[in-house]
């Protein structure tokens, strides 16, 4: 048996952990804005989804399967709770009523999933069946062939988030932010394509395992590259501005008095500034 799926999911979870730490530390150091904080949280939820899904594929008992899938759905609820807000921050398209309504829906589904005996995924206690992949790997069959009403409501919420994200990307492109919109468009295409593939799998149209995990990872990877590129460009532009500023040790306030502006440059230039601080041109 050649194990490909499970090791790949653990490898992707490592990348997600790195992205969450990278963006989280950058936010704590105040090198980037709140959009990166949302992205760090998204990365953490994708990490949780990958780990719980990988565990569910290897579940040995039915209670273990139900518990892992319950926590997987909880992480998915958190992902789609945060995702529209991140899209709003990235594109500048902020329909407040939709964002608040979407958040309310996912908080409700999060609570219901934890309260139901078998979670949102299962109507009754599932059986432990297996799926043989083309390359010989055997995993637990996670297809949801009998769906609860809450599962369908969650699916409707996902489709609504998809529609909003595509609309926001389109508006962003029309506003002239072509590079940003193209990067987001590619990420959304892979992300939503994998979700639609999941829907086809759950309805028995395709005999395969879910691919949404790859879509989550593709979204994270592409947008991480784009956001890091923007941060580097912003830092480079700031350095260019600072490099063109004349070095200054003291500046004048509104009343014409000299005030210390750059102690480090004063030490570098070996300048004696104590005789002019607080004075005007007429006092020197």
State each model region's role:
Residues 6-9, 33-36, 40-46, 50-59, ...:
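Interfacial "cap-and-anchor" motif at the non-cytosolic start of specific transmembrane alpha-helices
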Residues 237-256, 263, 267:
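PAS/LOV and related PAS-like sensory modules
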Residues 15-24, 77-86:
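Central hydrophobic cores of alpha-helical transmembrane segments in multi-pass inner-membrane proteins
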Residues 224, 250-252, 258, 281:
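Polar/charged side chains located within well-ordered beta-strands of beta-rich proteins
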Residues 1-16:
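Generic start-of-chain signal for non-secretory N-termini
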Residues 275-284:
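PAS-family sensory/regulatory domains
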Residues 265-276:
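PAS/PAS-like sensory domain cap-loop motif
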Residues 2, 22-33:
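Short, hydrophobic transmembrane alpha-helix segments
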């Amino acid at each position: 048996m050649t194990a490909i799926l499970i090791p790949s999911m653990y490898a992707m979870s490592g990348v997600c952990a790195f992205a969450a730490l990278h963006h989280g530390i950058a936010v704590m150091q105040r090198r980037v804005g709140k959009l990166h904080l949302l992205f760090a949280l998204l990365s953490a939820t994708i990490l949780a989804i990958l780990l719980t899904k990988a565990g569910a594929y290897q579940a040995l008992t039915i209670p273990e399967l139900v518990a892992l899938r319950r926590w997987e759905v909880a992480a998915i609820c958190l992902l789609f709770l945060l995702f529209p807000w991140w899209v709003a921050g990235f594109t500048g398209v902020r329909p407040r009523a939709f964002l608040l309504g979407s958040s309310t829906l996912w908080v409700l589904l999060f609570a219901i999933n934890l309260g139901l005996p078998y979670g949102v995924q299962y109507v009754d206690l599932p059986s432990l069946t297996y799926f043989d992949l083309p390359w010989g790997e055997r995993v637990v069959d996670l297809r949801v062939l009998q769906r609860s009403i809450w599962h369908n409501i969650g699916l409707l919420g996902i489709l609504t988030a998809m529609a909003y994200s595509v609309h926001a990307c389109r508006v962003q492109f029309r506003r002239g932010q072509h590079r940003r919109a193209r990067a987001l468009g590619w990420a959304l295409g892979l992300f939503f394509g994998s979700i639609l593939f999941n829907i086809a799998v759950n309805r028995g149209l395709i005999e395969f395992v879910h691919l949404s995990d790859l879509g989550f990872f593709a979204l994270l990877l592409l947008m991480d590259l784009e956001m890091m590129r923007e941060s580097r460009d912003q830092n480079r532009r700031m350095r260019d501005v600072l490099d063109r500023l004349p070095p200054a040790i003291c500046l004048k306030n509104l009343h014409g008095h000299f005030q210390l502006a750059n102690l480090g440059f004063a030490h570098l230039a070996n300048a004696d500034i104590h005789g002019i601080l607080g004075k005007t041109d007429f006092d020197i």
